[in-house]
Amino acid sequence: MANNVVVLGTQWGDEGKGKIVDLLTEDAKYVVRYQGGHNAGHTLVIDGVKTVLHLIPSGILRDNVKCVIGNGVVLSPEALIKEMKPLEERGIPVRERLFISEACPLILPYHVAMDQAREIARGKKAIGTTGRGIGPAYEDKVARRGLRVGDLFDMEAFAEKLKEVMEFHNFQLVNFYKAEAVSYEEVLEQAKGYAELLTSMVIDVTDELDAARKRGDKIMFEGAQGTLLDIDHGTYPYVTSSNTTAGGVAAGSGFGPRYLGYILGIAKAYCTRVGAGPFPTELYDGQEKQDPVGKHLGTVGHEFGATTGRLRRTGWFDAVAMRRAIQINSVSGFCLTKLDVLDGLKELKICTGYQMEDGSVLEVSPMAAEAFEKVTPIYETMPGWSENTFGAKSLEDLPQAAINYIKRIEELTGVPVDIISTGPDRNETIVKVHPFES
């Protein structure tokens, strides 16, 4: 039995991780975020009520769950407070159930200003960041000049460190990007306003999680974004700034890697991507590519980013990219989401290989974005189905063509599909194998 489960995306993000984490946390004591920031967007629908979380772990809607933000997360105090308010208005005791590592780097206004100024300067070569300061905050962390949650315990020392780092960033903003400087006084006053709140939620995350493990408590690690956006293993440079893969769990939470039991990879029954970067099976981008099937996927699937509101690019399921994700994460089983979006399509295609310019065929996706952009997808065509799968709760409720599609994905990837999502509500799910019971 796996007491410690990792839930992560195996595509380009937006796979539906939030719903699945919420579903599985019925049996969990802890839900831990270990990377990313408020660039994530996890949408939960419970009894018809929609909740979008960007920073707070998805387990916050469960009374039995303690939520933890690990050291691998870059934390925006402004975003956290904004997210806490509507939850507390609904009677959810966030301050009693949310805990933060003192080692979390802070995202401050100058990070946001720097992020946005850079994207403007890149012009047509823009990466497509959310503009929320994630990348610059991670840069400061690696450069060892970043401020962390723990620095808020000593505001006098915080003020000195802040002044030094802001001189560095403001010089770049004004002289290189021709943007306005960020006010030191305003940033400091804001920090004084939230210091007490943040420090009151600080715990020793490593010690807390290790004690939970020894007690036999079930722990869920909630990933953000997706494997193909990983800073090291994704389609670089069109990636995020953190390790979105299973390897990021230990580093981003301080939890021993040997204790991780089950890796649940979340994948849509098709593919989507937000922002720039290669996408071999792309059908629709709202501009140059206007395939009607791709438009169907985007419209029926409501493919707009929960964080940015941007239209997602859509395409066929890519088993080649999925094999890379399986290698990197040692995926135990899949959760296939949005199966119901495929309802009504006469035929479906699955990418089974990439043909290169020299005629060779790749069965696993390449590392570099440049190589990705040169591949031609090789497709296998399968019959679709006209029946309605929305809300199905058992395999018996699915048409045979849908079952065949799922089985083919299992054959092509070598990994079982243990969970199938057929709608946005936590109840609209088929659970073949429960990760905590595997």
UniProtKB/Swiss-Prot annotation:
Keywords: Cytoplasm, GTP-binding, Ligase, Magnesium, Metal-binding, Nucleotide-binding, Purine biosynthesis
Ligand binding (GTP): 13-19, 41-43, 312, 338-340, 421-423
Residues at which substrate binds: 306-312
InterPro entries in alphabetical order: Adenylosuccin_syn_GTP-bd, Adenylosuccin_syn_Lys_AS, Adenylosuccinate_synth_dom1, Adenylosuccinate_synth_dom2, Adenylosuccinate_synth_dom3, Adenylosuccinate_synthetase, P-loop_NTPase
Organism: Vibrio vulnificus (strain YJ016)
Family according to the record: Belongs to the adenylosuccinate synthetase family.
Binding-site list for IMP: 14-17, 39-42, 130, 144, 225, 240, 310
Entry protein name: Adenylosuccinate synthetase
Biological role stated in the UniProt entry: Plays an important role in the de novo pathway of purine nucleotide biosynthesis. Catalyzes the first committed step in the biosynthesis of AMP from IMP.
Compartment(s) of residence: Cytoplasm
Any single biological process term in GO: IMP metabolic process
Entry EC number(s): 6.3.4.4
Family annotation (Gene3D superfamilies): Adenylosuccinate Synthetase, subunit A, domain 1, Adenylosuccinate Synthetase, subunit A, domain 2, Adenylosuccinate Synthetase, subunit A, domain 3
Assembly, per entry: Homodimer.
Pathway: Purine metabolism; AMP biosynthesis via de novo pathway; AMP from IMP: step 1/2
